[in-house]
Design a protein with these regions (language model features):
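Short N-terminal helix/helix-N-cap motif within the alpha/beta-hydrolase-1
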Residues: 106-110, 137
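Short, glycine-/aromatic-enriched active-site segment of Class I SAM-dependent methyltransferases
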Residues: 130-155, 166
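Short alpha-helix
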Residues: 155-172, 178
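Alpha/beta-hydrolase-fold catalytic nucleophile elbow
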Residues: 128-130, 181
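Conserved catalytic loop of SAM-dependent methyltransferase domains
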Residues: 176-222, 252-255
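A short glycine-rich, Lys/Arg-flanked "PGG" loop and its adjoining helix->strand segment in the class I
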Residues: 109-124
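Conserved N-terminal segment of class I S-adenosyl-L-methionine
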Residues: 1-89, 95-99, 112, 143, ...
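Residues lining the SAM
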Residues: 99-102, 128
Length: 272
C-alpha cells in the first residue's frame, strides 16, 4: 500500500484539525452541480478531504508556494489570488469556504465584500477563524513564550462572534449557525507543539508564508522531521486523550470558531 501524503500523515496525528474537519463534514451540504471555492487552501489538506463529498472545487491561496505544495495533493484547479480582489466573475460560486484565512489578510472587510460578489444570490459562506476575547487566556501566554502573531502569519489575534456578526451583516450575510471547538486542553497542546517546532526543531526558517511557519509546510520539511514525527506518533494517543478533556469544559467557548452564513443581499455600498 502506498504511503499517505505528508499532509494526510500530519492530519492523522492532528488534534484541532481533526475536530475542525469533523465539524465541517457533519454540516456539509453539497450538490453535485455546486461550484465551490476554497479561499485560503494552504497546503490543500482540507480541500482534499471535503471535495471527496461532491461539487466542483476551485482552490485559491495568496501564496504561490502553498499552491505548488497543494498541487501534489489536489492536482488541478488551483488559482493564486489576493485578498482585495478575487479573479472570478460575479455570482460564479454556490459556496465559499474561507477557513483560517480571514485573520491572515490586511483588508478583511474587502475580502468579505469580494466573497459576497462572487457568490450567487442564494450562496453560502463557511468561515473559520480564531476566536478571541477576555477569557481566552492562552492568547496571553503566547508572547511569554516568544511567539508573535507574525509567526502564524496573522494580522490580528482573531475575532469575537459579535464582531463577525456585524461585519457579515454589513456585507450582506446572515449567520445561520455557528460552533466553536478547541477549548483549553486542545489549544494548550497545540500551542506547545507549535512552540517545540518553531523554537526547538526548526528555529531558523526564513520562508515567509501567508499562514506562517508553525509546522512542516512541505514534503521536504516533513522528511527533515521524520524522526521527530515518529517520536510524536508514539505519544500522540496520550495527547489525543488529554485533548478530549475539553468535553468537561462544557461552559467554555472554543479558541476556534466556525460560522455558516447565507448571502441575503448585495449591498450597494460594497466595494468592488
Amino acid at each position: 500500500m502506498a504511503e499517505a501524503s505528508w499532509q494526510v500523515q500530519l492530519f492523522q496525528r492532528s488534534i484541532k484539525k481533526k475536530d475542525k474537519v469533523r465539524l465541517l463534514q457533519k454540516n456539509l451540504c453539497l450538490k453535485p452541480e455546486d461550484k465551490i471555492l476554497d479561499l485560503g487552501c494552504a497546503q490543500g489538506l482540507i480541500s482534499y478531504l471535503l471535495q471527496q463529498k461532491g461539487g466542483f472545487w476551485i482552490h485559491a491561496d495568496l501564496d504561490y508556494q502553498n499552491l505548488l505544495t497543494a498541487r501534489v495533493l489536489l492536482q488541478r484547479n488551483l488559482v493564486q489570488t489576493d485578498s482585495s480582489h478575487l479573479p472570478f466573475l460575479s455570482a460564479s460560486f454556490d459556496q465559499v469556504f474561507c477557513l483560517d484565512y480571514l485573520e491572515h489578510v490586511e483588508e478583511d472587510e474587502m475580502c468579505l465584500a469580494e466573497i459576497n460578489r462572487i457568490l450567487t444570490s442564494q450562496g453560502r459562506l463557511v468561515l473559520a477563524v480564531p476566536q478571541t476575547g477576555s477569557f481566552f487566556l492562552l492568547h496571553r501566554v503566547k508572547p511569554l513564550l516568544g511567539i508573535k502573531l507574525s509567526d502564524y502569519g496573522h494580522k490580528r489575534e482573531g475575532y469575537r462572534l459579535s464582531q463577525l456578526q456585524a461585519m457579515l451583516a454589513h456585507h450582506g450575510f446572515e449567520i445561520e449557525k455557528h460552533a466553536s471547538f478547541a477549548k483549553f486542553f486542545s489549544e494548550l497542546i497545540e500551542l506547545l507543539l507549535n512552540f517545540i517546532y518553531m523554537k526547538i526543531l526548526s528555529p531558523r526558517k526564513k520562508v515567509q508564508l501567508r499562514d506562517g511557519h508553525i509546522r512542516p509546510m512541505s514534503a521536504k520539511e516533513f522528511d527533515q522531521q521524520k524522526k521527530s514525527f515518529q517520536l510524536y506518533s508514539l505519544v500522540y494517543p496520550l495527547l489525543w486523550g488529554l485533548s478530549r478533556l475539553d468535553k468537561l469544559l462544557f461552559w467554555l467557548k472554543g479558541y476556534s470558531l466556525i460560522i455558516w452564513a447565507k448571502k441575503i443581499s448585495s449591498p450597494e455600498n460594497q466595494q468592488k
